[in-house]
């Protein structure tokens, strides 16, 4: 069983090292993002099979809650991580498509959460903002602020 510990500021260098060696496919997977959100959703980490894994507890402090796993950063498979953690895991979140396909092939239920999907836009589409598709972005006004 691997040691799971709360994410702390002292973990910054090790997390950034893993993210540098294994660039994530999920845009929100940065140390800063994880650290900022650690109070609203308790985030833990563990090192397993030369990978780092982030675990979120959806419950309140003292409440058991559900443990939800992020995609491992490194070479470990999500299934081997679940076995190594030795805890009951309610699910995995924000996994790349190839991992989702692997989980489907293992007869696990996989659902797409479009509200948390990363989106890609063509540079020319954003530069021109042509058509109704970009109407809300066209009417956005940038207002400079002073500090």
Predicted regions, residues:
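A general marker of short, structured functional hotspots
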Residues: 14, 27, 31, 115-117
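Sequence-level detector for tyrosine residue identity
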Residues: 18, 22, 35, 119-121
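Acyl-donor-binding surface of acyltransferase catalytic domains
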Residues: 71-147
């Amino acid at each position: 069983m691997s040691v799971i510990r709360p994410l702390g500021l002292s973990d910054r260098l090790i997390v950034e090292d893993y993210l540098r060696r294994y660039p994530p496919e999920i845009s929100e997977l940065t140390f800063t993002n994880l650290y900022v959100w650690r109070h609203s959703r308790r985030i833990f980490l563990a090192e397993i099979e030369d990978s780092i894994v982030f675990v979120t507890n959806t419950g309140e402090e003292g409440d058991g809650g559900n443990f939800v796993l992020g995609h491992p950063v490194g070479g470990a498979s999500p299934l081997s991580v679940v076995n190594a953690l030795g805890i009951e895991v309610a699910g995995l979140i924000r996994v790349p498509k190839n991992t989702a396909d692997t989980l489907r092939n293992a007869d696990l239920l996989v659902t797409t959460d479009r509200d948390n999907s990363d989106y890609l836009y063509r540079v020319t589409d954003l530069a021109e903002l042509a058509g109704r598709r970009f109407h809300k972005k066209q009417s956005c006004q940038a207002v400079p602020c002073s500090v």
